[in-house]
Amino acid sequence: MRVTLLGTGDTTGTPTVGCACATCEAARERGVSRSRFSVHVANERTGESLLVDFSPDFRRQFLDHDVALPDAGLVTHIHFDHLDGLGNVYRLVDGLPVHAPSETDPATNESVAETIRRKYDYLGDRISVQAREPFAPFETCGLRVQFVPVDHPPLRCFGLVVVNPETGAKLSLTGDTSYDI
C-alpha cells in the first residue's frame, strides 16, 4: 500500500486568505502552502488506487503529485472541503464506484451516500454511489475497507480503516474529528 497525502490543509487551505493567525503567518514566512484534505492510496499489488475524499483542490493535487486517477472513491462526510471536488471527475472517469456511509445523519435527514446521489446527480453514470454500513468491511481495489464513526459535530463524520489482506498492512485515518475520538 502506497499512501500519498494530497492535501492536509484546513477547510480553506493553509495559509487561509486574509488570516493573520500564527499558523497562517508561519506558513507564509516559510513559503508553505497546503491544499485541502485528500489521500491517494495505491494498491501496488493490483495496480489500482482509491481516493479518500474529493477536495475542491482535486485538479491541482493530481497534477502536483502525479498520481493515477482513482479506481474507486471513499467519502467520509459532506463538508465541502471533503466532497466538492467530486465534480472534477466529469470527463475523467466512467462508472467510478464512490463508497459512502449509509447511516442517516439527524442533522440532514440523509446519509452521506444519499447526499452524494442528490447533489451529484448530474454526473449520471460517471459515478456509482455505493452505500456502506459503518463497521461493515467491504472490498475495493483489492483492499478491505470499513467506515468508522468519529466525533465531528454538527454532522456525522467517519474515519476509515484500510487493510491490505495480502500483507496485513493497515491504514487508519480520519480527515476531520474533534479531540473526543
What do these predicted regions represent?
Residues M1-D180:
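Binuclear metal-dependent hydrolase catalytic cores
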